[in-house]
């Protein structure tokens, strides 16, 4: 039996971004090299003189102003004419047969959305390697399997940096929540499953995703913590409540002065802290392929655990971070 060839013209690659910068240009260059006939929609805050670097066959540039990434995706999807859509981050680029493998799985399996592994860029700085290591740890990333080449499995959600699905599926569940600055992919995955849809992780649907530097990793985790409260306002989900563990950890750390008034708390505090640091120590050793990365990975995991709690606490206290300004990947 002759296998039906996948029509790459019936898929639109959607790339939301703030501005035109080198990571986005590289992303588009790779996409067009691999998929010259596949439509690409790039949704930006604004267009500038660099737009000429992106203007080529089958590429549409859309300027929206400073809006949420979810709303940008909604605008892009509404302007597509294809049956399938593939979301990709501006600081990423597809690996071999990314679209082909994703569409094949959508057609052959009883699923409505598919995503896959996020591989490191071939060339990274020391800090980026440490941030990447932290992202592989269960202490920082709940769905850490997507950072590794793990076996195929069904998921509660997958991040929209690498997600392929039918346009009609996206529209049926109402698209992304435009009011969420972060966590829109969690919310989207929740609504997919609520409607009886299955989400599949496959190690064959791969992209290369640039790791953040320490400054932008700190910012990402800070906004992630703030976003937990916004998600809980939408739905009292166990997974969202579980994410409050970072807040509890921060409160625990801030309780140190109590030891001066209640010595018994000093013993409890010390034992818990030693136990936690031991876990971070062994986790850092396990995921650091190069011994030279161990110390950097250790401290990056600490930052990844403490910073979300700060973001959550700021939100609870009634303050709002300038998420759109703070949250960026370049």
What residue spans do the PLM features occupy?
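Short, well-formed alpha-helical segments that are part of the catalytic scaffolds
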Residues: 19-33
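Glycine-rich, basic loop-to-helix element that forms the pyrophosphate-binding segment
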Residues: 64-80, 101, 161
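Conserved donor NDP-sugar-binding/catalytic core segment of glycosyltransferases
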Residues: 97-129, 205
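Catalytic donor/gating beta->alpha subdomain of glycosyltransferases that bind UDP-sugars
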Residues: 177-235
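Membrane-embedded multi-pass helical conduit in multi-pass membrane proteins
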Residues: 246-321
């Amino acid at each position: 039996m002759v296998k039906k060839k996948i029509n790459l013209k019936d898929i639109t690659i959607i790339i939301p971004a703030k501005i035109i910068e080198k990571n986005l240009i590289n992303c588009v260059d790779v996409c067009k090299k691999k998929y010259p006939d596949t439509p690409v929609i790039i949704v930006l805050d604004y267009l500038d003189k660099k737009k000429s670097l992106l203007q080529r066959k089958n590429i549409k540039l859309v300027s929206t102003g400073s809006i949420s990434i979810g709303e940008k995706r909604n605008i892009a999807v509404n302007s597509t004419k294809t049956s399938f859509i593939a979301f990709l981050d501006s600081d990423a680029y597809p690996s071999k047969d990314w679209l082909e493998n994703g569409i094949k799985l959508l057609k052959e399996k009883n699923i409505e959305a598919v995503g896959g592994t996020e591989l490191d860029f071939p060339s990274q700085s020391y800090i980026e390697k440490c941030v990447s290591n932290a992202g592989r740890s269960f202490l920082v990333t709940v769905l850490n399997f997507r950072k590794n080449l793990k076996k195929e499995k069904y998921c509660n959600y997958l991040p929209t940096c690498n997600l392929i699905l039918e346009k009609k599926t996206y529209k049926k569940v109402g698209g992304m929540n435009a009011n969420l600055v972060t966590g829109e992919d969690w919310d989207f995955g929740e609504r997919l499953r609520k409607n009886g849809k299955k989400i599949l992780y496959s190690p064959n649907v791969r992209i290369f995703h640039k790791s953040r530097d320490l400054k932008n990793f700190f910012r990402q985790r800070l906004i992630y913590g703030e976003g937990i409260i916004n998600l809980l306002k939408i739905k009292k989900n166990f997974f969202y409540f579980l994410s409050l563990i970072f807040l509890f950890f921060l409160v625990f750390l801030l309780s140190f002065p109590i030891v001066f008034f209640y010595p018994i708390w000093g013993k409890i505090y010390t034992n818990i802290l030693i136990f936690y640091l031991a876990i971070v120590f062994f986790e850092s050793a396990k995921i650091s392929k190069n011994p030279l990365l161990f110390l950097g990975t250790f401290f990056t995991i600490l930052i990844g655990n403490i910073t979300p709690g700060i973001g959550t606490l700021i939100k609870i206290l009634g303050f709002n971070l300038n998420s759109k300004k703070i949250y960026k990947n370049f």
